[in-house]
Amino acid sequence: MASSDVFVAAARKCLRVGKKRFSATVSLNLATQVLAVDLGLKPALLYDSNTASAEQVQQYLNSLQAAQLVSKSLQTLVISENSLIVNPSLTIANLEALLLRRTVTVVDVCHSLEQPAITELQWGAIRDMIQALLAHIRQFGQHSAMRNVPHRIEKRHCETWNLCTLFGILLGYPSTYWFDQSRSFENCLAMSPLVVTKAVASWQGGDSGVEGHRCCLYSFSTPEMLQADTQSVMASWTTQLQERFQQQKVLSGLSVTRSTVTLPSVAL
């Protein structure tokens, strides 16, 4: 059985919800994302293909690991009922770098603001959140017997975390949004031009019909008005991604594109 067929079969068997089964396209997109995490091209992926439980996501990951398609180091991390497949070593390295050098730009998009703005005021709370998450991930890594089950961070530990900010960091974005969720979950991005960055690659699997399969590895936005302020961190992120891409041979044809959109509302 070709590796692409194993990925598709694993998704259809483990991640099914109700009677609707995964299409080959959705299965291959997920497979490419998981491979990107395993290859160190991205630190984590947020599972959103359907409403499969964390246990189902872990079963899917276990199946791929048993077939030796991905390394056994990958883990399922559950934060506030959101399932992520993470590369622990890369995630830890990214979080440590963030604490040392503030490698991610934080953009305040509170609804009360007239326009988005880069903020330094929230670094104290963000630092505390990252330090707590690092402690959890390191603790999980010390229990090898627990690698085949989802690692859940209890609600009492993360109920005050700003998940919008955190997920942007965990997914490896060079900039992330912040808003005061104690006041409102709305933001000031409506009708504000946004530059959407996408990184797309092909799965070079060698299987018939798979080598040309294109998948979006990254997709995130930054306010157009802040392009001058975020140019340095964006350039560094792009260079780092290109360098990591050149160090592997599983995926090919990396393309990083940017386009500007203006939307009547933006959900974060």
From Swiss-Prot:
Superkingdom of source: Eukaryota
Disulfide bonds: none
One Pfam family here: DUF4504
Family listed: Belongs to the UPF0739 family.
Protein name: UPF0739 protein C1orf74 homolog
Lineage, top ranks: Eukaryota, Metazoa, Chordata, Craniata, Vertebrata
